[in-house]
């Protein structure tokens, strides 16, 4: 349910402005820091957000377990969440940032007017979508054939749809701040949502043991939290939106470029979001209507259900666990590097800099370092999550209505997702590289191919594997998509996306990750042989072993990425 400045001689300390090209502003912004500095800032704030998110999920799991109310609530929250990713954190911000960056360099006042127009357009579009969505829900509610789970899902959808324009506005305003070198407010805003949901769930459980009533209180809290998030981001962004003055004639060109990029991006991201939508819909409609049944009826046909009641909730809670390392590290790095890539792509190489690639050396260096850091973080995260999935699931969720059997179900799904945490991280970075080059069509075509593969695998694997088959399908499609993006980016740049130093770094990262598998993987068995079966103890021991083993392996292999991260500083050349 849920949402990243250094001496000018450093090629990675990318300035968003060229002081020689325009008069000095009365209130100049500080010199920009490296994307790695921003990435660590965002990672820290995202970690706080994800930790409060895990606390929220622990409360929800204790209240609802893997039951029909949890399924209905998460399906109801799916629509606004999908549109948040589509408009707020996806297509609009990806189309907006490169054009806003260019306009800000040339004319800050025009950039402010451009941002205001985009905000107004986003509000209008999402407002219309809410009205249409509420009308559709009302019409669906008139049908008498819904089960209790279906009726609750429609109710929660109706309550939470107004969150859609609020959270999209929050994500867009965060994008404005990113271009101005402020990554903190956007990364920290989800904490408000998490705290509001925790408070509502606690209140609902304390005042009523009726699960549907408690879920309704949480749904209302989601909308109220969205209002708070938007108010905070607007207050933080207002000086960048009010500096432009009247008149919009000088924004026509960037608006046109944004609109031309937005179409393919919307299609590409909409196609990609279909993966999450179809996963949830399959889990919802192919599950029995209540826990005491084993069959389900669809389109008039009754058959043995391939998944159990609570499949939607199980998917959501498993996704939270793999999204924690992905959001804290992978997406944080991709978010921070995007403005740097956009600025580098806008800077054409000089005659002396031109080589085999039409892009500036700064763009290629930034991309290569991003790839190395992404792998250095995400590959061991994949291995670690796979190894700690069972004690982690038990520690986070197993209490109240969430049983041992529920832990086993969610952990099995986490295993499928964990196989491709590194691929998800690469997808975010590589897609942003294409967007920085004003190419939205290639990611669209790649997304179409990946979705087709994912849907095919969903229908094939859900029957023998159940809900874990949906996670495994997503992981396989993500690996396929990451390799396709690498291939097409290599062709587009007319130069090596994975030069020798990057390939050598990737190989050493994989070796270091394999080296942590032995101590981390053997610890549970060793502790259990000593009669120590506490999930908390096993998880703590595995985490400590991993935190010691991987840096030790990286040091033994002389990997500079560890130093980059610890010092929050990148070298001038790789």
Question: What does each of the following model-derived ranges do?
Answer:
Residues 1-5, 9, 24, 354:
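N-terminal amphipathic/hydrophobic targeting modules at extreme N-termini
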Residues 13-574:
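Membrane-embedded alpha-helical bundles of multi-pass transporters/translocases
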């Amino acid at each position: 349910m849920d949402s990243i400045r250094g001496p000018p001689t450093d090629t990675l300390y990318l300035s968003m402005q060229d002081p020689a090209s325009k008069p000095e502003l009365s209130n100049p912004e500080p010199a920009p820091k490296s994307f790695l500095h921003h990435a660590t800032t965002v990672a820290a704030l995202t970690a706080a957000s994800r930790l409060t998110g895990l606390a929220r999920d622990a409360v929800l799991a204790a209240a609802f377990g893997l039951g029909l109310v949890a399924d209905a609530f998460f399906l109801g929250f799916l629509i606004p969440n999908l549109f948040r990713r589509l408009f707020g954190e996806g297509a609009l911000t990806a189309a907006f940032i490169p054009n806003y960056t260019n306009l800000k360099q040339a004319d800050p006042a025009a950039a402010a007017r451009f941002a205001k127009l985009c905000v107004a357009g986003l509000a209008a579009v999402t407002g219309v979508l809410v009205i249409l969505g509420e009308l559709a829900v009302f019409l669906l509610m008139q049908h008498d054939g819904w089960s209790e789970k279906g009726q609750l899902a429609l109710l929660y959808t109706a309550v939470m749809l107004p969150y859609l324009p609020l959270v999209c506005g929050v994500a867009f305003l965060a994008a404005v701040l990113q271009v101005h070198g402020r990554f903190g407010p956007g990364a920290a805003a989800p904490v408000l949502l998490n705290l509001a949901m925790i408070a509502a769930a606690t209140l609902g459980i304390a005042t009523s043991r009726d699960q549907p009533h408690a879920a309704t209180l949480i749904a209302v809290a989601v909308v109220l939290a969205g209002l708070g998030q938007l108010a905070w981001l607007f207050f933080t962004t207002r000086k960048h939106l009010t500096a432009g003055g009247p008149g919009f004639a000088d924004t026509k060109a960037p608006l046109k470029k944004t609109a031309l990029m937005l179409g393919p991006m919307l299609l590409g991201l909409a196609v990609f979001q279909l993966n999450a939508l179809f996963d949830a819909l399959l889990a919802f409609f192919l599950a029995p209507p209540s826990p005491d049944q084993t069959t389900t009826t669809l389109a008039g046909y009754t058959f043995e259900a391939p998944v159990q009641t609570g499949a939607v909730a199980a998917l959501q809670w498993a996704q939270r666990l793999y999204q924690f390392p992905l959001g804290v590290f992978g997406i944080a790095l991709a978010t921070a590097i995007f403005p740097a890539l956009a600025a580098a792509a806008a800077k054409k190489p000089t005659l002396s800099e031109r080589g085999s690639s039409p892009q500036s050396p700064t763009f290629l260096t930034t991309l290569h370092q991003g790839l190395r850091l992404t792998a250095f973080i995400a590959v061991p995260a994949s291995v670690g999550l796979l190894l700690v999935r069972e004690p982690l699931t038990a520690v986070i969720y197993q209490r109240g209505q969430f049983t041992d059997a529920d832990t086993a179900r969610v952990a099995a799904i986490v295993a499928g997702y964990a196989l491709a945490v590194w691929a998800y991280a690469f997808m975010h970075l590589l897609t942003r590289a294409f967007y920085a080059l004003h190419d939205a069509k290639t990611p669209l075509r790649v997304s179409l191919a990946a979705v087709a593969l994912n849907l095919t695998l969903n229908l094939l694997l859900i029957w023998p594997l159940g809900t874990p088959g949906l996670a495994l399908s997503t992981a396989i499609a993500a690996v396929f998509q990451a390799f396709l993006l690498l291939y097409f980016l290599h062709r587009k740049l007319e130069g090596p996306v994975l030069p020798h130093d990057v390939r050598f770094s990737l190989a050493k990262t994989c070796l270091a990750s394999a080296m942590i598998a032995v101590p981390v993987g053997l610890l549970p068995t060793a502790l259990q042989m000593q009669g120590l079966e506490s999930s908390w103890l096993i998880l703590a021991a595995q985490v400590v072993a991993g935190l010691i083993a991987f840096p030790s392996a990286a040091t033994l292999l002389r990997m500079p990425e560890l130093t980059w991260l610890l010092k929050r500083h990148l070298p001038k050349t790789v």
